[in-house]
């Protein structure tokens, strides 16, 4: 045993074996529990409309207005002029 004196007049008795006797608990009930595995990812809902599937062309054909080609030729000409 050793006595330590402090500046404020306090005296403390310290056991020499005190520092040697401190260890981390190793019992199973003192251990940090392992985390359980993560749950699986949430499954995506099935698409009702079938997005991403290749569609067939419409049975009646695509709508083709008669002046559509004229519109694009005017736009192309105006862009070429600038």
UniProtKB/Swiss-Prot annotation:
Where in the body, by tissue, does this protein show up? Answer: Expressed in columella cells in the roots and in root meristems after induction.
Which residue intervals make up region (Disordered)? 1-26
Keyword Cell cycle applies: yes
Q: Does the UniProt entry include the keyword Chaperone?
A: no
Q: Where is the composition biased (Acidic residues)?
A: 8-18
Task: Write the record's keywords in alphabetical order, separated by commas.
Answer: Cell cycle, Protein kinase inhibitor
- What induces its synthesis? Up-regulated by double-stranded DNA breaks-inducing treatments. Up-regulated by zeocin treatment. Up-regulated by DNA damage and oxidative stress. Directly regulated by the transcription factor SOG1. Down-regulated by iron excess treatment.
One of the protein's GO biological processes: DNA damage response
Any one GO molecular function term: protein kinase inhibitor activity
Subunit (UniProt): Interacts with CDKA-1 and D-type cyclins.
In UniProt terms, what function does this protein have?
Probable cyclin-dependent protein kinase (CDK) inhibitor that functions as a repressor of mitosis in the endoreduplication cell cycle. Acts as a potent cell cycle inhibitor, regulating a hydroxyurea-dependent checkpoint in leaves. Essential to activate a high-light-dependent cell cycle checkpoint.
Give the protein name, as stated in the record. Cyclin-dependent protein kinase inhibitor SMR5
Protein species of origin: Arabidopsis thaliana (Mouse-ear cress)
Kindly list the organism's lineage. Answer: Eukaryota, Viridiplantae, Streptophyta, Embryophyta, Tracheophyta
Gene assigned in the entry:
SMR5
């Amino acid at each position: 045993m050793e006595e330590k004196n402090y500046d404020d007049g306090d005296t403390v008795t310290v056991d020499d074996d005190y520092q040697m006797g401190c260890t981390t608990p190793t019992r199973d009930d003192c251990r940090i529990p392992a985390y359980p595995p993560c749950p699986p990812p949430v499954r995506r809902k099935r698409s009702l409309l079938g997005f991403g599937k290749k569609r067939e062309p419409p049975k009646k054909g695509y709508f083709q207005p008669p002046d559509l080609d004229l519109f694009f030729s005017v736009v192309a000409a105006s862009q070429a002029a600038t």
